[in-house]
Regions:
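PLP-dependent aminotransferase-like
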Residues: 25-87
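Conserved residues at the C-terminal ends of beta-strands
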Residues: 14, 35, 101
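Phosphate-binding glycine-rich loop
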Residues: 1-32, 45-49
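Short glycine/proline-enriched coil/turn segments at helix->beta-strand junctions
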Residues: 7-9, 25-31, 58-59, 68-74, ...
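Active-site region of PLP-dependent enzymes
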Residues: 83-85, 94-196
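Short alpha-helical
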Residues: 19, 40-41, 122
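Conserved beta-strand termini and adjacent loop/short-helix elements that scaffold enzyme active sites
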Residues: 14, 56-58, 193-196
Length: 196
């Protein structure tokens, strides 16, 4: 449902957006530039996945998406603080990755969790396999096979249930928050569009 909402073909649910960042950059051996005012989990995920971090000054990304890293043929977009209709379709190419967070303080909060969306089936299949201990996905557990060493990073059933329950009223929540943002902007002379 969330992939459809943001305009992507595929979505892989993960136990946290931090782990989604970690996996999306795993063994890329590159330098990733990130805003200096950002939760430490982002830098930690970049470093522990085998990369280096360089910081730049930027506060305008807060409450919005930003390009985490651009490779030769695709980019990774960190959208932990934003979730809007057709967001992937509007801001990404089919082979890009967009990462969402379902941490309790995020727009679509849950008990925790993350998601990677893309239109690239091969990337989607890789994520589905690596988060399931490197096993191929099959509805029947006994038909799963080990493809490669992976991680236990799949989203739990409890996380998914809470997120999907909250997703049912998400648009209403965004309308209410939008009205509050409008009031603050009008009264304080701001031009903020974030609902985070």
């Amino acid at each position: 449902k969330i992939a459809e909402y943001v305009g992507a073909k595929y979505a892989c649910a993960i136990n946290s957006a931090t782990n989604a960042i970690f996996l999306s950059l795993l063994n890329k051996n590159t330098i990733v530039n990130i805003p200096s005012m950002i939760p430490p989990v982002v830098a930690n995920a970049i470093i522990t996945s085998g990369n280096e971090v360089e910081f730049y000054d930027d506060v305008d990304w807060a409450g919005h998406s930003y390009v985490l890293h651009t490779f030769e043929d695709y980019k990774i977009v960190d959208s932990a603080q934003k979730l809007e209709p057709n967001q992937f379709m509007k801001g990404c190419e089919p082979n890009d990755l967009m990462i969402f967070s379902f941490y309790p303080t995020k727009p679509l909060g849950g008990s925790d969790g993350g998601m990677v969306v893309t239109d690239d089936y091969e990337k989607y299949k890789w994520f589905k396999t690596i988060v399931l201990n490197g096993m191929t996905y099959a509805n029947n557990n006994w038909e799963r096979e080990i493809d490669f060493p992976g991680y236990k990073m799949y989203m739990s059933s409890m996380q998914a249930k809470i997120i999907m329950n909250n997703f049912e009223s998400y648009d209403k929540k965004m309308r209410v928050l939008g009205n509050l943002v409008d009031i603050y902007n009008r009264e304080l002379g701001y031009e903020n569009s974030s609902k985070h």
